[in-house]
């Protein structure tokens, strides 16, 4: 038995934030020293490395669960189902609901419970819980939903990924420019024709890797040292991803009934354009092949990195034909992959 998506939804915030927005920021390095480059140069270099030209921020009156609800409602409409038939709501995020101009995470009750309430689902046996798994959280939620259905514990699962990273960034850290807000969701149920998830793999590396992404104080020493913001060691993450993710993708393919030539698209977490390109290039090199043309759709240029939300948003955009030169047709085999805080990696193969 395989399980497939019957509905996919997204919510992309309306507020566009271009790189020009950051030109008045004062950036510091890790030692608390003002960067000697002007902000125009910093923005240019960021675009060259990450590909990001602009990103989206949630409205001031919105929080993560609001974004997740919008994506969930979109997925339910797309699936044309009664929300009361959903057995599980799995909400992937990392920071909870964070109100505008605060940096306090609110995770109780769970964001999944909040979405269930907003959807007005009355069925008490619709179980709602959250997943905190770094950027791969939505993919891990899909893998968990797949397991529930295979085990006979559920027939239909809603998996949401949403984040408001703009609320947890240090405005004096240039990495702030990478992060964005957004939400995506999908509904999974058993397939009658063996379409859907064909194989999957997850891994966690929690030795020194666990500290590659963390909460730390502002680079501006005048800021309150007790207030923490999202921080990362970008070079270490890049090296980790390049060494581990291609191997995980290969193992997933090799453990399936497919081979490398069957893969028609790779839908990868939109973390960093150069890193994603390097991962895919190394993946194909493991098979002594060059990267096929138009194999990897990207939307990071206009939407930035919204963590758990990037993959479901990207998938919905492809399915809606919103990306030039990227379509998914019936029978296509797509490889999904993500990497993030933990450090966690996951991947799955899906036949449409």
Spell out what each predicted region is.
Residues 1-61, 173-243, 247, 339, ...:
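Condensing-enzyme catalytic core mediating Claisen C-C bond formation in acyl metabolism
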Residues 150-183:
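Flexible, glycine-rich active-site loops centered on histidine and acidic residues
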Residues 41-42, 65-79, 111-112, 240-256, ...:
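Short, well-ordered amphipathic alpha-helical segments that serve as non-catalytic structural scaffolds
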Residues 5, 61-132, 258-277:
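Conserved beta-ketoacyl condensing-enzyme motif
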Residues 39-63, 98-156, 282-313:
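Conserved catalytic cysteine-centered active-site region
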Residues 92-98, 132-137, 161-166, 203-204, ...:
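Acidic, glycine-rich active-site loops and adjacent beta-strand->loop/helix elements
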Residues 316-337, 343-352:
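Catalytic phosphate/nucleotide-handling subdomain of diverse soluble enzymes
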């Amino acid at each position: 038995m395989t399980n497939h998506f019957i509905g996919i939804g997204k919510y992309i915030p309306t507020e566009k934030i271009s790189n020009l927005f950051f030109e008045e920021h004062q950036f510091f390095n890790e030692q608390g020293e003002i960067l000697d480059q002007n902000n125009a140069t910093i923005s240019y270099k960021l675009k060259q490395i990450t590909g990001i030209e602009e990103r989206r921020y949630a409205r001031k009156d919105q929080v993560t669960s609001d974004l997740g609800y919008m994506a969930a409602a979109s997925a339910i409409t797309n699936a044309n189902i009664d929300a009361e038939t959903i057995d599980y709501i799995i909400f992937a995020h990392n920071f909870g609901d964070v109100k505008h101009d605060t940096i306090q995470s609110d995770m109780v009750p769970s964001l999944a419970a909040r979405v269930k309430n907003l959807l007005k689902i009355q069925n008490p046996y619709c179980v709602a819980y959250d997943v905190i798994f770094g950027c791969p959280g939505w993919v891990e939620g899909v893998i968990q939903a797949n397991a529930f259905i295979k085990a006979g514990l559920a027939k239909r699962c809603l998996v949401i990924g949403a984040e408001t990273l703009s609320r947890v960034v240090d405005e004096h850290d240039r990495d702030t420019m990478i992060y964005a807000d957004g939400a995506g969701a999908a509904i999974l149920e058993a397939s009658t024709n063996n379409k859907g998830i064909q194989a999957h793999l997850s891994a966690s590396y929690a030795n020194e890797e666990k500290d590659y992404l963390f909460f730390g104080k502002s680079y501006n020493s005048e800021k309150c040292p007790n207030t923490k913001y999202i921080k990362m060691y970008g070079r270490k993450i890049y090296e980790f991803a390049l060494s581990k993710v291609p191997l995980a993708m290969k193992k997933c393919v090799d453990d399936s009934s497919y081979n490398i030539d069957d893969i028609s698209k790779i839908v990868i977490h939109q973390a960093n354009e150069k890193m994603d390109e390097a991962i895919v290039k190394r993946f194909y090199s493991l098979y002594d092949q060059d990267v096929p043309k138009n194999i990897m759709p990207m939307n990071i240029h206009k939407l930035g990195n919204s963590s758990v939300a990037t993959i479901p948003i990207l998938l919905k955009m492809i399915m809606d034909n919103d990306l030039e030169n990227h379509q998914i047709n019936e029978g296509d085999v797509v490889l999904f992959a993500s990497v993030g805080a933990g450090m966690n990696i996951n991947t799955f193969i899906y036949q449409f």
